[in-house]
Amino acid sequence: MPVQGSQRRLLGSLNSTPTATPRLGLAANQTGARCLEVSIPDGLFLSLGLVSLVENVLVVVAIARNRNLHSPMYCFICCLALSDLLVSGSNMLETAVFLLLEAGALAARAAVVQQLDNVIDVITCSSMLSSLCFLGAIAVDRYISIFYALRYHSIVTLRRARRVVAAIWVASVLFSTLFIAYCDHAAVLLCLVVFFLAMLVLMAVLYVHMLARACQHAQGIAQLHKRQRPAHQGVGLKGAATLTILLGIFFLCWGPFFLHLTLIVLCPQHPTCSCIFKNFNLFLTLIICNAIIDPLIYAFRSQELRRTLKKVLLCSW
């Protein structure tokens, strides 16, 4: 889709990296400096998007089919899967349209292409924002279930969960439309970066607090049964490893994209920043990878959901 470089748009077109560039090599930027540029083949990008699409569709179908999964927690997980599905689907659609236009198989006026690009970018941006929000909502839900266990079902009701879901979707669509319309303003990009950092801090604080409570609980059980300290240390190490993986994946998959937005504001013309801008497709691919990993972390670990998914797949055959 015709744009003047990925730094000129919030999401930009997926043709910011030339297809003729080697998969991993050195490219020259506008100042003549040598840059490390990772080019993602269109086939690989579409394949990852398809895997994410299928995975998240299965999660949505499994939760919709099993009434036992119609709880606030699974409501958030289902919406996270739907957001990831839209992230993958919109990026796949944009890539497919660009390839068809490039090959001459699809003819359209420039104005129509630009409008289509705007619509796809709004869908992509809103699904990204909602995905981050639902990750935060899942963290809050788990926090309440641990620290307010006796009052959990009165605090987190299905009606309240649905209101939160509706608010997230409406806010995501509204703000993404504004972000795309005013993406040339530095304040818009900074708002997105601040939002990402806020979600990262929220998740880190909540999960670290939950880990501390789990360690205290394990220590209390160990003292009650007069067990040795290594049992408590084992729980702490396992919890710390899980927390590191969860937050590490979140940061590694989303961080580069928001670093890209930050550098657009701070150093749009600097040679080093220009080199980073060339890897925009890689940053989008990492977000697609996050959409693949999310169901493995939040959905498929549920035995009830796996049983439902197995029944759905067997019935489809």
From Swiss-Prot:
Chief localization: membrane
Record key words, sorted: Cell membrane, G-protein coupled receptor, Glycoprotein, Lipoprotein, Membrane, Palmitate, Receptor, Transducer, Transmembrane, Transmembrane helix
InterPro entries xrefs: GPCR_Rhodpsn, GPCR_Rhodpsn_7TM, Melcrt_ACTH_rcpt, MSH_rcpt
Parts of the chain that traverse the membrane: 38-63, 73-93, 119-140, 164-183, 192-211, 241-266, 280-300
Lipidation (S-palmitoyl cysteine): C315
Membrane topology: Multi-pass membrane protein
Annotated localization: Cell membrane
Gene Ontology terms describing biological process: adenylate cyclase-activating G protein-coupled receptor signaling pathway
Residues annotated as glycosylated: N29
CC per GO annotation: plasma membrane
Regions of this protein lying in the Extracellular compartment: 1-37, 94-118, 184-191, 267-279
Cytoplasmic face residues: 64-72, 141-163, 212-240, 301-317
Signal peptide as annotated in the record: none
Gene Ontology MF term list: melanocyte-stimulating hormone receptor activity
PROSITE patterns on file: G_PROTEIN_RECEP_F1_1 (PS00237), G_PROTEIN_RECEP_F1_2 (PS50262)
Annotated Pfam families: 7tm_1
UniProt similarity note: Belongs to the G-protein coupled receptor 1 family.
Quaternary context: Interacts with MGRN1, but does not undergo MGRN1-mediated ubiquitination; this interaction competes with GNAS-binding and thus inhibits agonist-induced cAMP production. Interacts with OPN3; the interaction results in a decrease in MC1R-mediated cAMP signaling and ultimately a decrease in melanin production in melanocytes.
Function text: Receptor for MSH (alpha, beta and gamma) and ACTH. The activity of this receptor is mediated by G proteins which activate adenylate cyclase. Mediates melanogenesis, the production of eumelanin (black/brown) and phaeomelanin (red/yellow), via regulation of cAMP signaling in melanocytes.
The protein's name in its UniProt record: Melanocyte-stimulating hormone receptor
The species this protein was found in: Trachypithecus obscurus (Dusky leaf-monkey)
Phylogenetic lineage: Eukaryota, Metazoa, Chordata, Craniata, Vertebrata
